[in-house]
Each structure stands twice: as C-alpha cells, then as structure tokens.
Amino acid sequence: MTTAHRPQFDPARGHSEMAPTRITSSRALPAHLKLKYRQESQGTEEEVRKQDLREALLRAEAAHFATQEHGASSEEVSQNSKLIEGFTSPSTDDKPNNDVEVDYQELLRQTLEADEDASDSDDSVDSSNKNSEVSIKRRKTESNSQESVDSSNSESSDEESDSEDETQQLLRELENIKQERKREQMLQEEKNRALEQEKREREIAFGNELLNKASSGSFQVKRRWDEDVVFRNTHKGVDDTPRPGFVNDMLRSEFHKKFLARFVD
C-alpha cells in the first residue's frame, strides 16, 4: 500500500546545486543597463523654459487672421508680422527694450475689425440676393393664388352640393354597418352563454363518480400497472429441469450419479 497521500512532517526543500554552471542565451540578458537622459534639441527642461509660448501664439493668430481677411493688403500683413517680430519677452532679456513697443490689444482689435468688415460685406450681398428672390416668389404666388380663387369660386357651388349628398349616403351606410355588427355580437354572446350553461349542467350531472355507480360500474382496476411492459411473463414456457453440464467435481457429476444408481442399491 502506498503512503504517497500521507502528509510529511519534513517536507521536501530545495538544496544548493552541486554544478551551478549554466549556459544563458544573449537574448535573456538585460539590454539596457543605464538610464538615458534627453539630449540637446530633444525638448530638455531648459529648452522648454526658454520657449516663448506667447510669441508663438501671437504669430499663429496673426497668420490665421491674415488668411481670413478678404481685402487685406500685403502691407498690413507685413506690418503686423514686423510688430510681432519686434516683441521681446522680459524673461529672456535682462533689460527691457524701450525702442520697440508693441500694442497687442491694438493689433488684435485691427485684425478683428478687418474680419468683421469682410463678414458684414458677405452678409449684405447674401441678404440682398435673398430679398430679390423672395420678392419674385411672392409675386408668382400672388398671381397663382388669384387665378386659383377665380376658378375655385365657379366650382365650389357644384362641389358643395355633391359633397353633401355623398356625406349623407355614407352616414346612412355607416349606421347600417354598426347595427349589423351589434346584432352579430349579441347572437354570438347568446350562443356562448348557452354552451357554457350546457357544459356546466353536464359537469354537475356526471362529474361526481361516487354518485354515478351505475354508469361507472365497479371501482376494480381492470388492468395491471405492468401489463404493457416489454419483459412481462418471460419465464413462461421455460423448462425448469436442470440441464446436464460439466461440473468440476467427480462426486457431483452426472456420470458418478448414474454409476452409483446402477451398481449400488
């Protein structure tokens, strides 16, 4: 009997290897052993600190407004760019530059006014075109409505008389249909009530088996519960006499029994 299933008081523990030599693949070795730092022109902290984000934003805004201006001349765009280029941030220079003074509010106001003038001109052209189209459409609709009124006045009298006759006829037909449906519904309800009453009377008369002994006969079970099974009465017609067979015992064999019956009284 095995004892592998029994718990051990001293479980197996790993031991030091006697031959620690191993062959390690180069792919299993660590690839990067030193921490890498950002080099110049790779977005170091000093470079980010020296960037003038305000100047870049103003350049981008000026370029955008210059492209949006429809009637802006090249002189105005160049003047705006020169004003932006002349700006120097106080963080980069130790002394403020008094020679070049830029009014950024004035610059933004000029660009916004130019943009608004262009949009107003476009809106005025569009509104004038729309007004002309609306006036033409209004004239056409007025002429068509006048013609339709003249023709409808002549036909309205005939149509009113015909429509009144048709509505009266339709109302009469609708009333007849409602009456027929109501009669059919009443007949169906009476028929259903008669059937339910007949069914109820039959259940009352023949529903109780104890009161209907004559009709039901006796309460004896006519069929057995295992009458329709597959292997029922399989032992019928089978010979119960023992068949001669081989017995591994000379004293109980058929030959020994016959021998004793013949020679021994």
Swiss-Prot record:
What Pfam families does the record point to? Cwf_Cwc_15 (PF04889)
Give start-end positions of Basic and acidic residues composition bias: 172-197
Give the Acidic residues compositional bias ranges: 113-125, 156-167
Query: Which Gene Ontology molecular function entries are recorded, alphabetically?
Result: RNA binding
- Asked whether the UniProt record includes Disulfide bond among its keywords, one would answer no
* Compartment list: Nucleus
Recorded hits in InterPro entries, A to Z, give: Cwf_Cwc_15 (IPR006973)
| Family annotation (PANTHER family) | CELL CYCLE CONTROL PROTEIN CWF15 (PTHR12718), SPLICEOSOME-ASSOCIATED PROTEIN CWC15 HOMOLOG (PTHR12718:SF2)
- Protein name, please? Pre-mRNA-splicing factor cwf15
UniProt lists the gene as cwf15
